[in-house]
Amino acid sequence: MSSAIERKSLDPSEEPVDEVLQIPPSLLTCGGCQQNIGDRYFLKAIDQYWHEDCLSCDLCGCRLGEVGRRLYYKLGRKLCRRDYLRLFGQDGLCASCDKRIRAYEMTMRVKDKVYHLECFKCAACQKHFCVGDRYLLINSDIVCEQDIYEWTKINGMI
């Protein structure tokens, strides 16, 4: 389960009453260290408020309040994406090398086939594909546009 993290800001010279909270931000207690939040910036996640440094992954300790980070909350644990997938994601096998693909690894997917990034290359010339490159999927083999005729001829398909 993924949770959104809200970034809040307040001007230290004036302490407005939060429209949702109906209490001044300086009276907020951090969900991590249990201290008052007097910082200009703070976070809201899992129905609690946090200092930026206190909202971290329970396993690896990485900061979860950084831009672009997602917070996963399961079984009472705050987790980064990598640790969430490591604990709860499903591993699979690469269609090219038949070796294990860990749930947190970056992959390429074509139809129902999944490949390690380093395995996603032309079976004939071994060239790695770039965005926009054209290829053909033949069984589990990926063949670049330039090698399709030769590949099918060698493998008795024409």
UniProtKB/Swiss-Prot annotation:
Pfam family, any one: LIM
Taxonomic source organism: Homo sapiens (Human)
Gene Ontology BP terms: positive regulation of transcription by RNA polymerase II
Keyword annotations of the record: Chromosomal rearrangement, LIM domain, Metal-binding, Nucleus, Proto-oncogene, Repeat, Zinc
The keyword Hydrolase belongs to this UniProt entry's keyword annotation: no
PROSITE patterns reported for this sequence: LIM_DOMAIN_1, LIM_DOMAIN_2
GO molecular function: bHLH transcription factor binding; DNA-binding transcription factor binding; identical protein binding; metal ion binding; RNA polymerase II-specific DNA-binding transcription factor binding; transcription coactivator activity; transcription coregulator binding
A GO CC term attached to the entry: transcription regulator complex
Quaternary context: Interacts via its LIM domains with ELF2 and LDB1. Also interacts with basic helix-loop-helix protein TAL1/SCL and can assemble in a complex with LMO2 and TAL1/SCL. Interacts with BEX2 and KDM5A.
Notes concerning its domains: The second LIM zinc-binding domain interacts with KDM5A.
Disulfide bond sites: none
Domain LIM zinc-binding: 30-89, 94-153
InterPro entries, per the entry: LMO_RBTN_TF, Znf_LIM
Function: Acts with TAL1/SCL to regulate red blood cell development. Also acts with LDB1 to maintain erythroid precursors in an immature state.
CDD domains for this protein: LIM1_LMO2 (cd09384), LIM2_LMO2 (cd09385)
Gene3D superfamilies linked to this entry: Cysteine Rich Protein
Disease linked to the protein: A chromosomal aberration involving LMO2 may be a cause of a form of T-cell acute lymphoblastic leukemia (T-ALL). Translocation t(11,14)(p13;q11) with TCRD.
Cellular compartments annotated: Nucleus
Identification of the protein by name: Rhombotin-2
Principal location: nucleus
